């Protein structure tokens, strides 16, 4: 579903229409009992306040309370994520331009580290920028974009030296009750004003054979808008 909604719209050239039609208020969603409470999105919002952009998602349960079980190995391991797909261009987060769908993701994965500069982050929820693209080999239809062997594309300074278009910036990330929040300095995200967004909770999986696609969207828990139409518009807060 995720891939069909998002990549289909991109192929039709409708992302620009979504940007123009977006509204400057939170995306609100009705609770769904079939969705695990900690991933059942009820509100997603992105605002700019003073010198920061603040991404927030609220859920029906306690945000961050459910984590994937450790498998003891990298291949085939699971990742849980709170995700904000956006209309940002990949060039605005340090990669080459026009590489795919830019999303901010707060993730937990107990079987491996992908922090910048070789740091450890397998035991904490932490933020990433990811660039997504369609791949039919993935159960969810989308992958974090692979870097082919031998290629050396432009990457941001906090790229974790893995063969993916992924960044590991150390943005302040907090979980409090039903909310997860990421605060990003506007000086690092100049294109956020007027951008469009949505909210997603999802599970990802590392390829068991460790080849492309390396990291797939495996299971979409919930999409805030219901149709991934990026109806949110970044607003200026007080």
Model-predicted regions and their roles:
Residues 35-133:
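Surface-exposed, glycine/proline- and aromatic-rich loop segments on solvent-exposed faces
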Residues 10-12, 22:
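Cleavable N-terminal signal peptides
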